[in-house]
Amino acid sequence: MRCPHCGNCDDKVMESRTLAQGDCIRRRRECLACGYRFTSYEHIEEKPFMVIKKDGRREPFDRKKLEKGIERALEKRPVSLNSIENIVTEIEDQAVLNSGLNKEIETTVLGEMVLSHLYSIDKVAYIRFASVYKQFSNLDEFVNEVKKVRK
């Protein structure tokens, strides 16, 4: 690896550690030319999984899009940004597991995952998300969903 201090490509690894959940390796290195010590990180480069839209189109999973939808549902609710980040990470992890070998998941499955998480955290956010996700077209559908939540 190229030394950030002198640019030489000869170094030795002083120490290696596995980080996170085993998907990252931290290495302490020493340049053999100038003695400068630096840290490098190795990550597995994973292919993103695809989301199958209702009309059959496929597009890469977009974590920011999921996060924005959940934030919108939880807007002005007593839920921290850290909690939202954790929800998004949990849903993303579930989606990766559910996508299988072909690395594809339907939006309906993702939507149900979001509804499940929101239901356990904040019922108002659940109703907000459900009204958009389930495309309520009249007040009766909205009221019926509220009645289900109250049970």
Swiss-Prot record:
Identify a single GO molecular function assigned to this protein: DNA binding
Q: Boundaries of each ATP-cone domain copy?
A: 49-141
Q: Does the keyword Zinc-finger apply?
A: yes
Could you list this entry's UniProt keywords, alphabetically sorted. ATP-binding, DNA-binding, Metal-binding, Nucleotide-binding, Repressor, Transcription, Transcription regulation, Zinc, Zinc-finger
- Report the record's Gene Ontology biological process terms: negative regulation of DNA-templated transcription
| InterPro entries registered for this protein in UniProt | ATP-cone_dom, NrdR-like_N, RNR_NrdR-like
Which segments of the protein form a coiled coil according to its record? none
The cofactor remark states:
Binds 1 zinc ion.
Similarity remark? Belongs to the NrdR family.
UniProt name for this protein? Transcriptional repressor NrdR
Organism listed in the record: Treponema denticola (strain ATCC 35405 / DSM 14222 / CIP 103919 / JCM 8153 / KCTC 15104)
Lineage of source species = Bacteria, Pseudomonadati, Spirochaetota, Spirochaetia, Spirochaetales
Gene that encodes it: nrdR
